[in-house]
A protein has these predicted regions:
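Flavin (FAD/FMN) cofactor-binding core of flavoprotein oxidoreductases
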Residues: 259, 266-301, 305
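A conserved short coil-to-beta-strand element within the FAD-binding core of flavoproteins
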Residues: 131-148
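N-terminal FAD cofactor-binding segment of flavoenzymes
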Residues: 19, 42-86
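Central helical "cap/lid" subdomain
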Residues: 37, 158-210, 271-274
Length: 308
């Protein structure tokens, strides 16, 4: 039996921890936030609920489909048969109800129920997860003690372990790289940011679709979050910015960001969204990943990138 530390309690960290625990190992997961699940996140602002991280997901791999099927059987996720659309004009559409349906796109997605954060909570059952714990350093005690030691951001020890597994965004993992090989591999990947605007309305909007892929200059997609299965609460929209927009505005005033994206989305839909009863925004500095400069054989190095 090995004593194993996993840094990060997102989907990758939790599934890895579960598998290692089931194999008989002593696993401790460290999470810097108070919540778990990473981008499988949900925010509540009564009476509204917003899945403000991963909106939904698909399964195109047999192994992952098996994992999803188990979650379906356990009542943790449900199929979302999406009414999906794309605007006639990626910048302006005065008749949102006339948006044509997308051809060749997924029509079924999976979502956590009753919210996306239910997946992380389910996977964490039975695992030792130390929340609100930021790892500050990794100390190599090889070959004398044949172990690794974790320190928190105050320099206090978190324990010694046989293995340490990084399940954090690649940009954060770079600070813990132990060798030039680690750095070289991590530099092959980049993470792009995303801002998520959350709008809650007292009265439903006149939209005939639940998912609109915009791909405009500022807006990437618009989702009627309250239309997902098993959702409670008021009518809610979740609006995702493009990475380029977030790069330009992430350090700006929160209210200014909310107003900017609200105006941009209003222009796309042809509806005044400023009437929302609730408005909020969340910036993800590390939202989606892309591989850069990959070479043959890189997949054999044993690194896993979760880019949603």
């Amino acid at each position: 039996m090995k004593r194993i530390a996993i840094i990060g309690a997102g989907l990758a960290g939790l599934t890895c921890g579960k598998a290692l625990q089931q194999a008989g190992h002593d696993v401790v997961i460290f999470e810097k936030s108070r919540g778990i699940g990473g981008r499988l996140a949900t925010r509540r602002a009564e009476p509204f609920y917003f899945d403000h991280g991963v909106a939904a997901f698909t399964a195109s791999d047999d192994d992952f489909q098996g994992f999803v099927n188990q979650l379906l059987a356990e009542g943790v996720v449900a199929v979302w048969a999406v009414d999906q659309a794309t605007p006639d004009n990626p910048l302006v559409s005065t008749k949102p109800h006339s948006m044509p349906r997308v051809s060749g796109c997924y029509s079924e997605y999976y979502v956590g129920i009753p919210a996306m954060n239910a997946i992380g909570k389910h996977l964490a059952r039975g695992l030792t997860v130390r929340r609100n714990t930021r790892v500050g350093a990794i100390i190599d005690h090889h070959p004398i003690f044949n172990s690794w030691e974790l320190l928190n951001d105050k320099g206090e020890t978190l324990g010694q372990f046989d293995w340490i597994i990084s399940a954090m965004p690649v940009e954060q993992a770079k600070s813990f790289a132990q060798t030039s090989l680690h750095t070289k591999v991590l530099n092959k990947y980049a993470l792009m940011p995303c801002s998520v605007l959350m709008l809650g309305f007292d009265t439903p909007l006149a939209l005939d679709y639940e998912y609109a892929k915009i791909e405009g200059e500022d807006i990437d997609k618009i989702i009627v979050n309250s239309a997902k299965p098993h959702r409670e609460g008021g009518y809610s929209l979740v609006i995702y910015s493009t990475p380029a927009w977030t790069n330009r505005h992430i350090e700006e005033d929160k209210t200014a960001c909310i107003n900017h994206l609200t105006r941009a989305a209003s222009q796309v839909l042809g509806i005044d969204l400023s009437t929302a009863a609730h408005k909020d925004i969340h910036h993800w500095r590390y939202a989606t990943g892309e591989a850069v400069n990959l070479q043959s054989g890189d997949h054999q190095l044993g690194y896993l990138l979760d880019s949603d």
